Amino acid sequence: MSPSIWEKCLKYLQNKLSPIEFSMWIRPLKAEFKKNILILYAPNEFSFNWIKDNYIENLKKLLKNFCNINTTPTLMLKICKPKIIQKKFFNELTLKKNILNSKLTYNVNTKLSNIIYSSEINTNYTFQNFTKGQSNQLAFKTIYKIAHNPGKNYFNPLFLYGKSGLGKTHLLHAVANTILKYKNTIKIIYINSENFIQNMITSLKNNTIEEFKKYYRSVNTLLIDDIQFFAYKKHSQEELFHTINALLNRNQQIIITSDQFPQKIHGIETRLKSRFECGLTIRIDPPDLNTRTKILIKKSHIYDINLSYKVAFFIAKNLKSNIRELEGALNKILANSDSKKKIITINFAYKTLQELFSLPKKSITIKNIQKVVSNYYHITIINLLSQCRLKSIVKPRQIAMAISKKLTNKSLSEIGREFNGRNHATVLYACKKIKKLQEKNNNIKKDFLTLLKILSS
């Protein structure tokens, strides 16, 4: 018997059974061939007994259908031993992703009994590559704490909400990956709400709703993304409500995300909203300028794009919506550059991304100029306005004054007052100084023009 026969069996069963039933009972089986014997290894005793009572006879019939009567192998069922994971099994041959409704990810150190629970988890999303900032600091600290001690705190369920593209899904996957790495005896599921609903519908059609319930209520950590998709789906909400209750009664961790605060989600039952809010609710806001700049720098390293801080700052100043918008900008830069190693300039970024930039101009204030210049030079506004005479502070201060003169209608005296009560002579000196420096120093000229472009865009 060739290994392809077992592959055919798997594909047949995958089309015949519900996604939950297949993922829960069939896919974890490991196959080994010895002479004319097919040995199936169940991951644990519970699975062994269930397969023996419910599937073994059908599996024997299926083998006969795919084999000649004289070549049908003897079928044996055993409980998997730890060393079996090191062997190359035939049913680990790649099944096409478009056939699978649920992607199962695990590593060689993960116990077999947990493999079926780690569905849809993206291993690329970790805490290490998540960019922290003021807008997501509380969410990050809380979820990081939960990941290292799930179900052992008062943050249950944890409800994260915010607009699309702010990192909620990234944090859910980071939790899952951390738990699988450090607590691989814990059973964990990440699932998008639409997939949960679809799995439930399929289970109802195939009369396997009890398996569906056992699957979701037997986990230790449940991560549900985009809960707003349950709106106006009465039966799905009913099942979700009982699933949440079952897990909370066992002190199992639940983390939920949404694009809105629980009470503002239309079409969700009041009792379910109450469950969402009985733990801790945290809002994630759009990233601020510094965080957006850090995100671009970090992503540029991943994309292998030669992006300087000043160019990243320029892009971040003009793209303010969400992280996906920033990633889209980098993709566009990469697509339009001659090579990955090309040095990206402000002008190149502007020409490439001008369609993405927020074009409506806002009135420019001196306070806004002070903020942008301070961020650009990595100094605080307090230092910018202080009496400090360090060159690293004086030059940004003078540039800020010169830009204020150029971009606002304020008098020299009015500008001076905004700079901690300085007089008009100080501002005039700063403007003349920066003008002369631009003629001699290309770096000063470049900084001045870059800041003008940032503030004018």
From Swiss-Prot:
One Gene Ontology cellular component: cytoplasm
Region described as Domain II: 71-119
Residue segments, region Domain III, AAA+ region: 120-337
One Pfam family here: Bac_DnaA_C
Region Domain I, interacts with DnaA modulators: start-end pairs: 1-71
Top-level lineage group: Bacteria
Primary subcellular site in the record, as a coarse category: cytoplasm
Renumbered residue ranges of the record's region Domain IV, binds dsDNA: 338-457
One example GO MF annotation: ATP hydrolysis activity
Stretch forming the signal peptide: none
UniProt KW keywords: ATP-binding, Cytoplasm, DNA replication, DNA-binding, Lipid-binding, Nucleotide-binding
UniProt cross-references to InterPro entries, sorted A to Z: AAA+_ATPase, Chromosome_initiator_DnaA, Chromosome_initiator_DnaA-like, Chromosome_initiator_DnaA_CS, DnaA_C, DnaA_dom, DnaA_N_dom, DnaA_N_sf
Binding positions (ATP): G165, G167, K168, T169
GO biological processes: DNA replication initiation; regulation of DNA replication
Compartment(s) of residence: Cytoplasm
SUPFAM superfamilies: P-loop containing nucleoside triphosphate hydrolases, TrpR-like
Entries under Gene3D superfamilies matching the protein: 1.10.1750.10, 1.10.8.60, 3.30.300.180, P-loop containing nucleotide triphosphate hydrolases
Subunit annotation: Oligomerizes as a right-handed, spiral filament on DNA at oriC.
Domain free text: Domain I is involved in oligomerization and binding regulators, domain II is flexibile and of varying length in different bacteria, domain III forms the AAA+ region, while domain IV binds dsDNA.
Job description of the protein: Plays an essential role in the initiation and regulation of chromosomal replication. ATP-DnaA binds to the origin of replication (oriC) to initiate formation of the DNA replication initiation complex once per cell cycle. Binds the DnaA box (a 9 base pair repeat at the origin) and separates the double-stranded (ds)DNA. Forms a right-handed helical filament on oriC DNA; dsDNA binds to the exterior of the filament while single-stranded (ss)DNA is stabiized in the filament's interior.
Family the UniProt entry places it in: Belongs to the DnaA family.
Protein name from the UniProt record: Chromosomal replication initiator protein DnaA
UniProt organism field: Buchnera aphidicola subsp. Baizongia pistaciae (strain Bp)
